[in-house]
Amino acid sequence: FLLLNFGTFILIRFPKRRNNPPAFFVFIALAMLADLKGTTLRLLILAGWWDVIPSRTEILLQYQAFPLLLIMGVGGFLLPKLFGNAVIDPKSLSSQSNSSIRFLLLLGLTFLLSYGVQYWGVHALSTRIGYGIRAVVWLWFLSCSLRVQHVPSKFPAYLTGGRVAPYFIAMGLVLPVFFPTYTLAWEHLIFITGFLWLTL
């Protein structure tokens, strides 16, 4: 129901903003795709038409891929401006070149592909590869999009959570590559610490 409302909102707003959507909004479309796929798998499992997935792929698509892609979609243009303490001008959110959009689309699809890697194998290697792919995409987002290495050390207190959260999310994606046995514990860094700090 929430996904349907979100899709309706996009359809209503698209005619008004179709000439200047930020290229990073590609991630938002992929986030909706991930949530739709996860929801479909969950319904099939509950109906008994699909075997329970040991790798929890349907849960990860709904509660990890969906919010992370949303963060990359919205945060790709919003967080750098907030970190720079700049006024957000809607006119600056102009569409970028097709090559840039294609590159971001490729990154987003690669991000989603990592969940397929985990689906087809439930052993430690598939977990390492899946999280490794996601970690690379997320670290690119931090260094090349958010440019956290250039974030000033002094900024308003209300941005503290927004600055700390991406690092905890990165830790939650990197640690399963080296210690897959404790993947569920590392996911708490993403779900609880990372997402929680972003909302504060």
Stretches found by the model and what they are:
Residues 1-200:
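Hydrophobic alpha-helical transmembrane segments of multi-pass integral membrane proteins
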